[in-house]
């Protein structure tokens, strides 16, 4: 399994937007991304840091349901 890459918060937001998420708000150092469909709404907070830690990135991937391959190097 390839390793997860190092991404900034803005890079993560761009990847999530490609997966159908929209930024609904940003306050302080966190942006909130949201994806709605007929069944449920998925909300994911993204820290807008220069480099997001690997554990935090793993949590964002798990919460969003985005494919891990989009974040691998």
Positions of PLM-derived features:
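Generic anion/oxyanion-binding catalytic loop in active/binding sites
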Residues: 1, 46-49
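N-terminal first-folded block
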Residues: 1-27, 35
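Glycine-rich, flexible loop/turn motifs
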Residues: 3, 42, 67
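Amphipathic, hydrophobic secondary-structure cores in small proteins
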Residues: 21, 27, 31, 43-47, ...
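Short linear loop/turn motifs
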Residues: 30-33, 72-73
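Short helix-start
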Residues: 35-44, 51
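C-terminal structural segments of small proteins and small subunits
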Residues: 48-73
């Amino acid at each position: 399994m390839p390793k997860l890459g190092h991404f900034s918060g803005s890079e993560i937001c761009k990847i999530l937007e490609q997966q159908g998420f929209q930024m609904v708000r940003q306050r302080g150092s966190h942006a909130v991304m949201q994806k709605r469909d007929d069944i449920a709404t998925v909300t994911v907070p993204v820290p807008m840091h220069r480099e997001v830690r690997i554990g935090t990135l793993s949590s964002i991937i798990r919460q969003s349901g985005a494919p891990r391959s989009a974040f691998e190097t």
